[in-house]
Amino acid sequence: MAKNSRSQWIAKNLQRLLNVGLIALAAILVVFLIKETFHLGKVLFVNNQDASSYMLIEGIVIYFLYFEFIALIVKYFESGYHFPLRYFIYIGITAIIRLIIVDHENPIDTLIYSGSILLLVVTLYLANTERLKRE
C-alpha cells in the first residue's frame, strides 16, 4: 500500500508541475498572440502591396497557430487533463498550410505538402467517427 500511495503522490505532483508549465506556456502564447496582432496591424498599412499581402497571409496563419495552441491548452484543462487528438491534427494542417504559403517555389514539395494535408484530413475524419470519438 505504501508503494501505491507514493506512486499516486508522485503522479499528483508531476501533474501539478505539468499544469503550472502549461499555464506558463499559455501566458507566453498569449503574449505572442498580442505581438502578432500588432504585427498584422502594421502589415495592413504597408504601401508595398506584393510583399504586404504575402506577409499579411503568413501573419494570419501564424496567428491561427498561436490561437490553436492556446485552444489546445484550454481544452486540456476542460477535458480533465486530456489532449484531444483532433486539435493536434488541426495544428498540423495549419502548419503545413503556412509552409505552403511561405515556401511554394518547388512544385513537387507543394504537391507532397498537399498530400500530407489530405492524409491529415482523412485522419481527422477517422478520428471523428463514432468508433474512435471520445467526446
Swiss-Prot record:
It comes from the Bacteria. The chain crosses the membrane at residues 20-40, 54-74, 82-102, 107-127. The keyword tRNA processing does not apply. One of its GO terms (cellular component) is plasma membrane. Keywords: Cell inner membrane, Cell membrane, Membrane, Transmembrane, Transmembrane helix. It is found in: Cell inner membrane. The keyword Membrane applies. One of its GO terms (biological process) is cellular response to phosphate starvation. Its main location: membrane. It is a multi-pass membrane protein. Belongs to the PsiE family. PANTHER family: PROTEIN PSIE. This is Protein PsiE homolog.
